Amino acid sequence: NQLASSLIKSGYEIKGKRFFDTICFKASGWKEKSEAMNFNFRDFGDGLVGISLDETTTESDIENILDVFNAKLNLDHSKSIPDNLVRGSRFLSNSVFTKHRSETEMLRYMHKLELKDLSLNTSMIPLGSCTMKLNATTEMKPVTWPEFSNVHPFAPTNQVGGYHTLINELGDRLVQLTGFDAISMQPNSGAQGEYAGLMTIRAFHKANNQQERDICLIPSSAHGTNPASAIMAGMKVVVVECDDQGNIDEVDFEKKATEHRDNLSAIMITYPSTHGVFEPSIKQLCEIAHDNGGQVYMDGANLNALVGLCEPGQFGVDVMHINLHKTFCIPHGGGGPGMGPIVCKDHLSKFLPSHTSISSPNENSIPAVSAAPFGSSSIL
């Protein structure tokens, strides 16, 4: 609020009467000076500038920000939170916050909690393939380097050349490893990758004047995120039966693909499957889908089992997500931020997600699926 009151006193008009950590106001001639002082403010493009502060902002920072706009610090400022929103009840009232009064007591309490934890030093973590691994210290340490961790996801392109080189080189390698033609680093997780891939398929059908294609065939053995992603992408799920060994029932698959050939949008297949089964008929399944007008989405959650042996792009798959925090062992830490980029064949590449902070050469791109243009880029 001190920044806002100082700007108001200097003649600026703040948009809105109530705010939390961000203010917007009209200003001009500030960009070069702000960059020279190592500040990046949001330029809305119509003379409106946005500034966000957090708990690390100091009074010295505020003075320097004000200097960019030739404004002076106002020491007489009021609170921006209205009285009816100020908390009046007690907080941290549980006894746990007051019973450990010495360093020794706190140490023993924390150790007691530690002993309750199920971790890799006592057992295997039974929570899925992304948590059943141990990141080496050499993989975790770079995440703490300020050159990676202190870069804002919307930083101007000319200030993050190293990041773009890293992202582009990694993307090229992933495309080559998987046998596809293009990649989007935007999805933050495998589930988000599923959604992005299916939305890309929907955009492809729409561009071909086949927006009526909204049926998605999914095996009964699929991970729960598959049907959820299909529903979120606006598709209708048709379940395909599996046999006792976990294999897709080819007869049932072909029957349902043929039955819905006029509005088949996609099939989703996990390879190897959630049961650990390598479908021997993967190529035939892809051919059946294509013969009936559908596209093939492959869930790459278990890609680790085959990436060193073959390229999914050669199976007939059109788009696939990669769990980098699984297959390629990027830092994840048993539940931290993940990365689920999608790779696709050339005919789908122009529909990959766009983002407002970067220019996209494709006018047919689907909207952003993540808040940041390159997802959780600090762990790449």
For the regions a language model picked out, list residue spans one by one.
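Conserved phosphate/anionic-ligand binding catalytic regions in large, soluble enzymes, centered on
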Residues: 52, 56-57, 118-139, 186-197, ...
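Conserved C-terminal alpha-helix-loop-beta "cap" of PLP-dependent enzymes
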Residues: 2-68, 73-80, 107, 113-118, ...
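Conserved PLP-enzyme active-site core in the AAT-like
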Residues: 7, 20, 24, 161-162, ...
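Structural motif of enzymes handling amino- and sulfur-group chemistry
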Residues: 1-13, 366-380
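Gly-rich Lys/Arg/Thr-decorated short loops/hinges at beta-loop-alpha junctions or inter-strand turns
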Residues: 14-17, 86-87, 145-158, 176, ...
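Flexible inter-domain linker/hinge segments
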Residues: 59-126, 130-138, 143-149
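Short acidic-aromatic active-site loops that bind/stabilize oxyanions
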Residues: 96, 156-168, 187, 243, ...
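Conserved N-terminal alpha-helix of the aminotransferase class I/II PLP-enzyme fold
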Residues: 6, 102, 148-188, 193
